[in-house]
Swiss-Prot record:
Listed name of the protein: Uncharacterized protein BH3399
Lineage: Bacteria, Bacillati, Bacillota, Bacilli, Bacillales
InterPro entries (UniProt xref): Aminoglycoside_PTrfase, Kinase-like_dom_sf, Pseudomonas-type_ThrB
Any Pfam family hit: APH
GO molecular function, one term: amino acid kinase activity
Family, similarity comment: Belongs to the pseudomonas-type ThrB family.
Gene3D superfamilies given in the database record: 3.90.1200.10
Top-rank lineage group of the source organism: Bacteria
Length: 329
């Protein structure tokens, strides 16, 4: 989640018809069909949907204070590699300047922008999924991991690791968050003792939830690799299945997902026993990111959508804080 102050200044450019002159200005570097650019959402990134020559695409951009340009380029390198392995992964589109990422300077800030092809298929909620779809979902994640285990050495993709994430946690959590600091110390010690091998550790998607998956009959497409990082592969399984509730390998949906995963790649099943630790690691990182997001640029003049979002995020922060306090009574 980006800073709410960043969100506010960009969403303010969106009119009642969901159009934005800022988005259209950015898209001049790719081209677009007139009156086809519409705001879709803002969370970790700003997303606009549009058409060019009648074909559907998505514009993704963010303020330069939110993302690292080098890391975006490394993400796209990974996405292109997976696409070259015949996986249905949303691919970036070259701009008129032959760039995958455009740096766009505007009166309200500098933005890093990427355009992606739209994936075929439909979005499903967890409650809608049948056993076959759960299997395919797990199979797709396993296929992604299997390919990432075999990334050529000359590709050398540079992305953050779990250690980098915990360094950010340390930076963003104030020292008066006593329970969170205790949780950070405990999780750091726990993660340090986990085994690391080529088969159990590497680049993960990090956010392979159903929002980032498209089902197309018997195939699955994936998108949104912007949080990809070096973690244990099991963490990707645990994080993908958050909608299933508390992670238990005996839960039917989780069993089916894991069965699909194992049909595509090796799974070090002993690490599934560490699911609670991975959940707590995710909570800690999410807590820190939300604290940063709910920044101090607050005003009673905020638009209604932002006030509601701020309240929801503060509620999440309080829930995480309570869980840390319960862990360290």
């Amino acid at each position: 989640m980006m800073k709410l102050s960043t969100m506010k200044k960009v969403v303010a450019t969106v009119d009642k018809k969901w159009r934005s002159p800022l988005a259209e200005f950015i898209l001049e570097r790719w081209g677009f069909d007139r009156h086809s650019v519409f705001y879709w959402r803002a969370s970790a990134n700003f997303i606009f949907m549009f058409q060019h020559h009648g074909k559907k695409y998505y514009l993704r951009f963010n303020d330069s204070c939110e993302r690292n340009l080098t890391l975006i380029k490394e993400e796209l390198k990974l996405v292109q590699y997976l696409g070259s392995q015949a996986l249905a992964i949303a691919q970036p589109v070259l701009s008129k300047n032959n760039n995958l990422v455009e740096v766009v300077i505007t009166p309200i800030g500098t933005f890093y922008a990427v355009v992606f092809e739209a994936l075929d298929g439909e979005h499903l909620s967890f409650e809608e999924m049948n056993e076959e779809q759960l299997f395919l979902w797990g199979e797709m994640l396993g296929t992604i991991h299997e390919n990432l285990k075999n990334v050529p050495n000359d590709l050398a993709i540079k992305r953050p690791s779990w250690k980098d994430d915990l360094e950010k946690v340390k930076e963003w959590i104030p020292s008066n968050e006593i329970a969170a600091m205790k949780e950070l110390e405990m999780i750091s010690e726990w993660a340090d003792q986990l085994p690391i091998t080529k088969e159990n550790f590497g680049i993960i998607h990090y956010d392979f939830e159903l929002d980032n998956v498209r089902f197309n009959e018997i195939t699955i497409g994936a998108l949104d690799f912007d949080d990809c990082a070096y973690y244990w592969y099991v963490a990707d399984i645990v994080y993908a299945l958050r909608d299933a509730g508390k992670f238990r390998v005996t839960t039917p949906a989780i069993k089916t997902f894991i069965k699909g995963y194992k049909s595509s790649t090796f799974l070090e099943e002993e690490l599934l026993e560490e699911a609670n630790g991975f959940e707590r690691l995710h909570h800690l990182v999410s807590f820190a990111r939300l604290l940063r997001s709910v920044d101090k640029d607050y005003s009673k003049e905020e638009p209604g959508y932002l006030m509601d979002l701020r309240k929801n995020l503060v509620s999440l922060i309080n829930n995480y804080r309570l869980s840390f306090e319960q862990n360290h009574k």
